[in-house]
C-alpha cells in the first residue's frame, strides 16, 4: 500500500513512523509512505498557505491554491493507483474513525491524507477529497495526528504486517466487540489467579470463554457496540442470562 501525506509539517511523522509496526511494514515493503509539503506549492514569494477569512473572524484559513496544486501533483505522480485509491481529508466534521473503516481502507492500494492546520480549510478544498474523517468529537491542532492514528490502524490490517496472522482478528473492535481479558505468567500474582479454563488446553472451551468474556466486557464498557455487532442466538442468550 502507498500512503501520501499532504502536510506542512512532514517532520511530525518521523517519530511515530520511525518505530514499531509501521517501520517494520515500511522496511518489509508492505507500506510505502511519502510526504508532500503543500507550502512548496504556495504562489507568493513568502510561501503563505493561509489567509484571513472573508466575513471576519478569528484565526487563519488554509488557501485553496497550494492545496489543490499539491494534491493534484500527488495524484498525477501516482496514476498507477487511480483505480483503487482514496483521498481523505482530516476534519472534525467527518464521521468518527472506527475499526470497520480501518478494514475498509485497508482494501485500497493508495491512501492520500490531506492534513490541515490553523483555523481550518477553505471550503473549496473539501472537493479534493473522497471523504472526511475525524477521530471523534474534539478539536486537534492539525490533521497530522489523526493521519498517524489512521495509518497505524489500517496498516495492522495488511497481510504480513503483524507478527502473527491471527493477531488482527483478535484485536479489540475487529469483530465489533471489545477484546477479552488477556493473561500471561505468573499463574498467580498477589492472590489473583489466571482463570483455570485458559490452562487446561481445551481450545474449544477457551474460545467459548473468550467470546463470552468479550461480550461481558463490551456490555460493561461499550454497550452501544452490541447494537451493531453480529451476535449469534447463543450470544444473545448468554447476554440475557447475564443481565
Where are these regions (language model features)?
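N-terminal nucleotide/polyanion-binding subdomain common to many enzyme families
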Residues: 1-77, 199, 204-227
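S-adenosyl-L-methionine/SAH cofactor-binding core of RNA-modifying enzymes
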Residues: 63-113, 122, 159
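Charged phosphate-binding loop/patch that engages nucleotide di/tri-phosphates or the phosphate backbone
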Residues: 224-243
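Internal, active-site/partner-interface "lid" segment
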Residues: 145, 157-200
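Structured adenosyl-cofactor binding patch, chiefly the S-adenosyl-L-methionine
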Residues: 121, 125-171
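Short, glycine/charged-enriched secondary-structure capping and boundary segments
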Residues: 19-21, 102-105, 127-129, 147-149
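Hydrophobic/aromatic beta-strand patches that form the interior of the parallel beta-sheet core
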Residues: 4-6, 34-36, 88, 111-112, ...
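Phosphate/anion-contacting hairpin/loop surfaces
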Residues: 116
Amino acid at each position: 500500500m502507498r500512503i501520501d501525506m499532504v502536510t506542512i509539517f512532514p517532520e511530525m511523522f518521523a517519530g511515530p513512523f520511525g518505530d514499531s509496526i509501521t517501520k517494520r511494514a515500511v522496511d518489509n515493503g508492505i507500506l510505502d509512505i511519502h510526504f508532500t509539503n503543500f507550502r512548496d506549492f504556495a504562489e507568493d514569494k513568502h510561501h503563505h498557505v493561509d489567509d484571513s477569512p472573508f466575513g471576519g473572524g478569528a484565526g487563519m484559513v488554509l488557501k485553496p491554491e497550494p492545496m489543490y496544486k499539491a494534491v493534484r501533483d500527488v495524484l498525477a505522480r501516482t496514476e498507477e493507483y487511480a483505480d483503487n485509491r482514496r483521498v481523505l481529508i482530516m476534519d472534525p466534521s467527518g464521521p468518527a474513525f472506527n475499526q470497520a473503516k480501518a478494514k475498509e481502507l485497508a482494501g485500497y492500494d493508495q491512501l492520500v491524507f490531506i492534513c490541515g492546520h490553523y483555523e481550518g480549510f477553505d471550503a473549496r478544498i473539501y472537493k479534493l477529497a473522497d471523504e472526511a474523517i475525524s477521530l471523534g468529537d474534539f478539536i486537534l491542532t492539525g490533521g497530522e495526528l489523526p493521519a498517524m492514528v489512521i495509518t497505524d490502524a489500517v496498516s495492522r490490517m495488511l497481510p504480513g504486517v503483524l507478527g502473527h496472522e491471527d493477531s488482527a482478528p483478535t484485536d479489540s473492535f475487529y469483530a465489533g466487540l471489545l477484546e477479552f481479558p488477556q493473561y500471561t505468567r505468573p499463574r498467580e500474582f498477589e492472590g489473583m489467579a489466571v482463570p483455570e479454563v485458559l490452562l487446561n488446553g481445551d481450545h474449544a472451551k477457551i474460545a467459548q470463554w473468550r467470546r463470552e468474556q468479550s461480550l461481558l466486557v463490551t456490555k460493561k464498557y461499550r454497550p452501544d457496540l452490541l447494537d451493531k455487532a453480529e451476535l449469534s442466538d447463543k450470544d444473545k442468550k448468554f447476554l440475557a442470562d447475564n443481565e
